[in-house]
A protein has these predicted regions:
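Beta-sheet entry/capping signal
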Residues: 3, 95-96
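C-terminal output/effector regions of signal-responsive regulators
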Residues: 145-363
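Conserved phosphotransfer microenvironments
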Residues: 39-91, 101-109
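Conserved acidic segment of CheY-like receiver
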Residues: 1-33, 67
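Alpha4 helix (beta4-alpha4-beta5 surface) of REC/receiver domains from two-component response regulators
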Residues: 76-91, 97-163
Length: 363
């Protein structure tokens, strides 16, 4: 069973989300269920610290695995501010998913997600708007379950190897150990520039509020893995990025089961892999070697009509634009923006998109 505390001030939204969770392994716990609506802070201590104490007790009492936090809590006027909950939950080291309802779709659908992740990736996993208030709401419960399992897998790995939290182990070393292969830690060095943000140590007066050191570090490691490493393709690639790496149109994987079956040997099975298929770039390289450098021209798939992204240079690597989500060739890709981690070698933005965005492209 996965228990999710939803901090939302609109009762109809809570009821709707609970309806989606009916007959699943997930159950939503509302602010009313834990007495959060009646919580009244005193003037003797900061609101955030009082909330941290209150939430720590309730999370333990109800066995809460994950918190789902709305960014706008101003309508019901029965809860504290979003920023207060955000700060309190970060002091606890509790995994959080945040969301913002409403809004319209855009051709640059990935841009808001990128902006939020870069700005607040060290404090929450963002749920896309379409999943909380659009045409993909049926994806909410499975996504929350997968996210909760991801954090839990990291936490259990740290519990099983307590030495990882002692001594001079870097986040790259710990992540490699959690993923079951200490030899791959170098793959994540290019993502270490933001480690001071993702792995900031709590101040002395705040440390007493954390649920546990293992929980705090598991949450930090989870944010870094999902929001930074898996968001910006490099050693771990999303399914579209994996197809592009092989210069194959992503839609071809659904058309040809033989093709998707061949890629399974390269599939990533670590934390958060249940959210969507991901693949190891190193395993894709081995796969290319097995298929003489090009899957499409290999004898096993010669009878299939497989569409390429770059039709002019079949041997080239292609990409998925970080902003539009569409396939692009190497010639269409702009120079890598400075907000992309140096380790994200497969992360590119369409040059035309970058020009159209103008100042927004600075994120």
């Amino acid at each position: 069973m996965c228990k999710v505390l939803i901090i939302e001030d609109q009762l109809d939204i809570i009821d709707r989300f609970k309806g989606f969770a009916a007959d699943t392994e997930l159950s939503f716990i509302s602010p009313t269920d834990i007495g959060l609506v009646g919580f009244s802070p005193t003037e003797d201590e900061a609101v955030e610290e009082q909330l941290a104490t209150f939430l720590k007790n309730k999370i333990g009492e109800h066995g809460i695995d994950l918190v789902l936090l709305d960014t706008d809590l101003s309508r019901g006027r029965t809860l504290q501010t979003h920023s207060s909950y955000k700060a309190a939950l970060r002091e606890l080291g509790m995994p959080v998913c945040r969301y913002q309802k409403g809004g319209t779709t855009s051709e640059f659908e990935q841009l808001p997600q990128l902006q939020r992740t870069i700005r607040d990736g060290a404090s929450a996993i963002w749920i896309p708007r379409a999943i909380v208030s659009g045409d993909r709401m049926h994806e909410l419960v499975p996504r929350l379950i997968a996210i909760s399992r991801g954090f839990k897998a990291i936490y259990e790995a740290l519990q099983a190897s307590p030495e990882l939290l002692k001594g001079r182990h870097s986040p790259t070393d710990v992540l490699a150990a959690v993923l079951g292969n200490s030899a791959i830690s170098y793959e994540f060095l290019g993502y270490a520039a933001q480690n001071l943000v993702y792995f900031a140590n709590p101040e002395a007066h705040v440390a007493e509020y954390q649920i546990s050191e293992e929980q705090r570090f598991a949450t930090q490691l989870g944010y870094w893995l999902f929001n930074y490493i898996m968001m910006f393709p490099g050693p771990i690639l999303s399914e579209p990025s994996a197809a592009a790496y092989l210069n194959i149109q992503p839609s071809e994987l659904k058309k040809h089961s033989e093709l998707s079956e061949a890629l399974k040997v390269a599939q990533y099975h670590g934390p958060f892999s249940e959210i969507a298929p991901y693949f190891w770039r190193s395993a894709l390289i081995e796969l290319l070697n097995d298929f003489d450098g090009d899957i499409v021209r290999n004898e096993a798939f010669r009878d299939l009509e497989i569409a390429r992204i770059d039709t002019q240079s079949p041997d080239s690597v292609a990409y998925i634009c970080l902003v539009s989500g569409k396939p692009i060739t190497e010639q269409q890709a702009a120079p890598t923006p400075d907000w992309v981690p140096s380790g994200a070698s497969e992360a590119r933005v369409d040059d035309d998109v970058l020009s159209e965005l103008g100042p927004l492209a600075g994120i």
